[in-house]
């Protein structure tokens, strides 16, 4: 079949949905591949690198008019005009964006949102949320180290001793764990907080200290266990106690990295304005949840501004909304492998596209088909 990969048009998006590595494997299966000229340049992939593995270089209309289109983010209204009714689309389409899904259905597309894949062992190799969150956690620490005006590691020099940076990480999912590991490698002293008690061992195994908040009721304990690897909203009583403990650590922190997200819900507020005021001048907050708050601007920190780096009360707040795009080459490589593994479920050995609703991963990812959401 004809598989097209257009250049991403969303502002700041540098990733590409297919690399020469995955293109070579798809080509070996007999597919015709079209990539828009320049689609991979921001991810350090030239048109020549694609051509070397048998990919045809095309314009945007050519790539978008294929039977199967691979993208990173959802297509714009302009891109949808070039897509054929009945075509298939695979990408990170945001399964909670009802308006966006309605547009895809209106265009007659069979679309799959990879973020909706179940958190099962079988689906691990196509888990785009984990592969990209891993990169976000790493880059958040690197960005923080760049903005922070002191060293991360402790140094003992002839001119005196420099203290290690104190880093507090809020939310210990994939991004949080990678942030702990990266900050530890840079020599920081790390504390981490999460609502799930099961992550305490993981935090300590990476060299961090877990900020423990005991549970006082069965309801609190049950909510803390989470579902499908994600946290659930916690009772107000526990959140108040956690806020007190976290506030103490944030006041002493040099760097705060917040990663707390709940699928389909607004990002919880973990850092208030008073907490920012309590921090030392020159401290840094990197908010991975920027733009995911109820207002679409903030994140885990009440003062975060999505897409901007601002200084408030002497604290630098980084609101970068697409950290994986700052590591475009590796982010694209991992994402393209996720896509390739998903395609094995919807393309038969004969090279035909087939939607198998008996497959739990395919059924979970299918967002629109035959004009219906």
Regions found by a protein language model. Give the residues of each.
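Generic hydrophobic/aromatic pocket-lining and core-packing "Φ" positions
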Residues: 23, 47, 80, 101, ...
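Adenosine-phosphate binding glycine-rich loop
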Residues: 115, 121-158, 289-290, 294-373
């Amino acid at each position: 079949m004809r598989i097209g990969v257009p250049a991403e048009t969303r502002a700041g998006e540098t990733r590409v949905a297919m690399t020469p590595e995955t293109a070579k494997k798809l080509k070996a299966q007999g597919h015709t591949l079209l990539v828009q000229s320049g689609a991979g340049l921001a991810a350090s992939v030239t048109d020549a690198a694609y051509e070397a593995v048998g990919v045809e270089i095309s314009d945007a209309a050519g790539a978008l008019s294929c039977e199967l289109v691979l993208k990173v983010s959802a297509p714009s209204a302009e891109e949808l005009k070039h897509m054929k009714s009945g075509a298939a689309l695979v990408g990170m389409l945001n399964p909670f964006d009802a308006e966006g899904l309605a547009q895809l259905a209106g265009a007659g597309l069979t679309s799959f949102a990879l973020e909706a894949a179940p958190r099962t062992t079988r689906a691990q190799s196509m888990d785009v949320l984990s592969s990209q969150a891993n990169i976000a956690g790493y880059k958040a620490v690197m960005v923080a180290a760049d903005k922070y005006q002191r060293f991360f590691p402790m140094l003992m020099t002839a001119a005196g001793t420099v203290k290690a940076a104190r880093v507090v990480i809020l939310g210990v999912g994939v991004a949080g764990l990678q942030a702990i590991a990266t900050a530890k490698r840079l020599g920081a002293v790390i504390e981490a907080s999460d609502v799930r008690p099961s992550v305490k061992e993981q935090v300590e195994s990476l060299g961090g200290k877990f900020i423990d908040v005991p549970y006082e009721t069965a309801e609190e304990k049950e909510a803390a266990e989470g579902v499908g690897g994600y946290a659930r909203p916690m009772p107000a009583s526990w959140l108040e106690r956690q806020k007190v403990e976290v506030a103490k650590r944030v006041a002493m922190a040099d760097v705060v990295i917040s990663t707390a997200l709940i699928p389909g819900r607004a990002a919880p507020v973990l850092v208030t304005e008073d907490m920012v005021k309590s921090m030392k001048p020159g401290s840094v907050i990197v908010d991975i949840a920027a733009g995911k708050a109820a207002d679409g601007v903030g994140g885990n920190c009440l003062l975060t501004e999505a897409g901007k780096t601002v200084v408030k009360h002497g604290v630098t707040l980084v609101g970068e909304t697409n950290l994986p795009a700052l590591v475009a080459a590796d982010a694209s490589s991992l994402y393209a492998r996720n896509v390739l593994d998903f395609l094995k479920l919807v393309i038969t050995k004969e090279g035909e596209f087939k939607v198998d609703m008996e497959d739990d991963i395919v059924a979970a990812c299918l967002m629109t088909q035959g004009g219906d959401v």
